[in-house]
Amino acid sequence: RVCMGKSQHHSFPCISDRLCSNECVKEDGGWTAGYCHLRYCRCQKAC
């Protein structure tokens, strides 16, 4: 499943936490994304 995530400045594709970089961590109740910042994957929490 793929959703659209948002950072403070732009949107980016969101992917399953299983596909996210191992340097990222899953946000509680949320999707992880291919864009990582401060070891967290930033994404909206709903599709």
UniProtKB/Swiss-Prot annotation:
This is Defensin-like protein 2. Disulfide bonds join C3-C47, C14-C36, C20-C41, C24-C43. Keywords: Antimicrobial, Disulfide bond, Fungicide, Plant defense. GO terms for biological process: defense response; defense response to fungus; killing of cells of another organism. It comes from the Eukaryota. Coiled coil: none annotated. It holds the Pfam family Gamma-thionin. Belongs to the DEFL family. The lineage of its organism: Eukaryota, Viridiplantae, Streptophyta, Embryophyta, Tracheophyta.
